[in-house]
From Swiss-Prot:
Stored Gene3D superfamilies: 1.10.287.310
GO CC term, one of those recorded: cytosolic large ribosomal subunit
Record HAMAP family: Ribosomal_uL29 (MF_00374)
GO molecular function (one): structural constituent of ribosome
Biological process annotations from GO: translation
Keywords for the protein's UniProt record, in alphabetical order: Ribonucleoprotein, Ribosomal protein
Origin species: Fervidobacterium nodosum (strain ATCC 35602 / DSM 5306 / Rt17-B1)
Protein name per its UniProtKB record: Large ribosomal subunit protein uL29
Source domain of life: Bacteria
PANTHER family per record: 60S RIBOSOMAL PROTEIN L35/50S RIBOSOMAL PROTEIN L29, LARGE RIBOSOMAL SUBUNIT PROTEIN UL29C
Keyword Transferase: no
Record lineage: Bacteria, Thermotogati, Thermotogota, Thermotogae, Thermotogales
Membership in a protein family: Belongs to the universal ribosomal protein uL29 family.
NCBIfam families for the chain: L29 (TIGR00012)
Gene of this entry: rpmC
Length: 66
């Protein structure tokens, strides 16, 4: 997801998306541990999405807008 797409969501949607991404990351890590994950780069992409969401939530909390 791009930061623009994330910024267009409200806080409730972002929190829901954050929980979904965390569950996805957990599942990807399990698949990787079992050797079933075909594309390990998905773990890194998911972690970056989580960081983007958290950053935007924190910006809103502090009243910062880029």
């Amino acid at each position: 997801m791009t930061p623009v797409e994330i910024r267009n969501m409200n806080n409730e949607e972002l929190l829901k998306l954050l929980e979904e991404k965390k569950r996805t990351l957990m599942n990807l890590r399990f698949q990787n541990a079992l050797g079933e994950l075909r594309d390990p780069s998905l773990i890194q992409k998911t972690k970056k999405d989580i960081a983007r969401i958290k950053t935007i939530l924190r910006e809103r909390e502090l009243g910062i807008r880029r």
